Structure formats: C-alpha cells, structure tokens
Amino acid sequence: MTNIRKTHPLAKIINDSFIDLPAPSNISTWWNFGSLLGICLILQILTGLFLAMHYTSDTTTAFSSVTHICRDVNYGWIIRYMHANGASLFFICLFLHVGRGLYYGSYMFPETWNIGIILLFTVMATAFMGYVLPWGQMSFWGATVITNLLSAIPYIGTNLVEWIWGGFSVDKATLTRFFTFHFILPFIILTLAVIHLLFLHETGSNNPSGIPSNSDKIPFHPYYTVKDALGALLLTLTLMTLVLFSPDLLGDPDNYIPANPLNTPPHIKPEWYFLFAYAILRSIPSKLGGVLALVLSISILAIIPLLHTSKQRSMMFRPLSQCLFWLLVADLLTLTWIGGQPVEHPFIIIGQLASILYFTILLILMPAVGIIENNLLKW
C-alpha cells in the first residue's frame, strides 16, 4: 500500500516540502535561518494574537492597556516581552539570512530573491507600526518623524502625510489604522513566505560551493529536520534568556513615558534594527536626498544580481570578495552604532563616510573585484 503522505492531496504538499524534499548534502548552519524565520513569524503571530485580545487602540487607553497586560493579565508580561524581543530575534535572523544570500550568491535565483526583498520591506513596515502601538514617547515621536519623511515627496508629500495620519498630526486615527495594519500584515507576510518557498522549491536550494548539487542530494527528513530542530532550540533558548533576564535590554527607556505631543525626547531614534538605515537617512543634509538614500539602502538588494560579475556564484573560493563582504558587515555595524548617537561631531562625519562606503562597496567595489578575480584565475 502506498504511504498516505505521498497520496493525500494535502499531506503530499507537506511531504514534498519538508520530508522527501531533495536537499544538497553540504548546506551549512547558514541555511538554518529560513526555518528560524518561520518559527519567529509563527511565534510573533501567536503572541500578537493574545496581546491583541487585551490591547486597546485608543490614544487615551493604549499605554495603560499595555500596563494592564503586564500587571493584571495571566502571564501577560511574558507574552508582551516575548513579542517585543521576538521582533529583535526576527531581525537578527533576517539580516543573517540576507547576508548568507549575498555571500553564497543565492540572489542568482531572481524570483526567490525578489520575493525576499518584498518580505523584508513588509516585515520592516510591520515592526515600525508595532513600535507605535504602546503609545510611549518614542512610539509617538518615532511615528511623527518617520511618517513626516513622506512630506519630502514633491507636490503630493504634505497631502500624503496628512492622509496617512488621518488628520493634521499623529493622533487617534493614526494609532487605530497602525493597529489595523500591524494585525493584518503578518498574515500577508505568511502568504509571501509560502510563495518564497514555492519559488525556492522550483530551483532547489543553493549550497556553500555555489556548484549545482543535483548529483548529490539527500532527503530533507531526517537530516535537516534534526538540524533545524537544534536551531529552533538555540533560538528559543536565546529568546527566553533575553525575556527572563533582561527584557528591556533592546528597548528604549523613553517608551515607558506616556506619549506627550508637547514634550520632545532629547534623542528620537527607532528600534536598534532600523538604526543602520536611520544613520544613512541622517547623513544626507537634504530631506528628499535622505529619504531616497533610506529607500535605496534596502532596495539596492534588487540590483545585486545585475552587479554580479564573477564567473563563480559563491564567495567561498573568492578571498578578495570575502574581504569586501566582511568590510560591508563592519560598515553596517558602524552605521547601527552611529544611528543611536546624537547628531554632533564626530558622529556626523563618521555616519557620512560609512554611508558612502556602504554604497561604494555594493555598487562599485564588489563588481570590480569580481572582474579582478576572474582575471587572476585567467577565466
């Protein structure tokens, strides 16, 4: 008798995706982050669902409803902190996942890569709107500053900002619509993630060598299910350590002060995972220029496949490209640090130099080094 998992219409889909899926035999731990992102997403949806049961999206009660969740709801504090710190781990996994894609040339699967970029933008939008919901000082002023950037768009800018706000300032209407979108977007992300997987399974996974591995495939289960289970265990351990020992480590203390439109915090800054983009935004004196640089800092990923000049897919055997890649990582860490600093000397010039270096590495140096490496190998 044929196994039900291979014949049943629904079980067959799961079987072909997670059990009998042919996978390269040499994929490393860097390939674990896809499954970890899936776990993060499900965790965020579940904790978010329970938070939404007790949260009220009204400017007068939003802050106190979060306090109520932490003080009065059974295990509300742990749900709230798992959701907040889960977002941080989500972004850590996202950045490592994208970094893996850049290093090993996974961007040569254009459909999967482009859906991934859309996913990145959607997750960033969701996280930004979620940060506004507790209605603390940084929530309010972060929302005001970031939405106000759209006013830099010529001609329609001001109307666009007021349309998003639902009035002449960030107020009740803004909070309500942000809650609505913050609730619906994770389900859109889930759908996009399924499409992302669908496109990936059309081509099969890349591997560290960048060489087609069709002649050497192994079943996903048990090899990679066990490997993913270990990753999940370590992710859970990291999350719970963060939640139970230092839940506010990655948050901003200003967000424990209720939102007050009459009192501006000394340093308005977003969550840590947006600081690199925020530093690029601030490093350009012109408002419109800054907004364009901000958008380009992420959307530049879309043209990475066009800038691939090397005859090898992966960076595994390309030491010069490896040096540039790690320089890019160091540069992004520098930008993250600068984004959290006040706008004063020497941080301004460091931010400007780091921003220039970021675009120079991706647009000029990496393609040039690819050509140099081809010539060194006489290819």
Swiss-Prot record:
The cytochrome bc1 complex contains 11 subunits: 3 respiratory subunits (MT-CYB, CYC1 and UQCRFS1), 2 core proteins (UQCRC1 and UQCRC2) and 6 low-molecular weight proteins (UQCRH/QCR6, UQCRB/QCR7, UQCRQ/QCR8, UQCR10/QCR9, UQCR11/QCR10 and a cleavage product of UQCRFS1). This cytochrome bc1 complex then forms a dimer. GO terms for cellular component: mitochondrial inner membrane; respiratory chain complex III. It is found in: Mitochondrion inner membrane. One of its GO terms (molecular function) is ubiquinol-cytochrome-c reductase activity. Its cofactor is heme b. The lineage of its organism: Eukaryota, Metazoa, Chordata, Craniata, Vertebrata. InterPro entries: Cyt_b/b6_C (IPR005798), Cyt_b/b6_C_sf (IPR036150), Cyt_b/b6_N (IPR005797), Cytb/b6-like_sf (IPR027387), Cytochrome_b (IPR030689), Cytochrome_b_C_euk/bac (IPR048260), Cytochrome_b_N_euk/bac (IPR048259), Di-haem_cyt_TM (IPR016174). Binds 2 heme b groups non-covalently. A ubiquinone binds at residue 201. This is Cytochrome b. GO terms for biological process: mitochondrial electron transport, ubiquinol to cytochrome c.
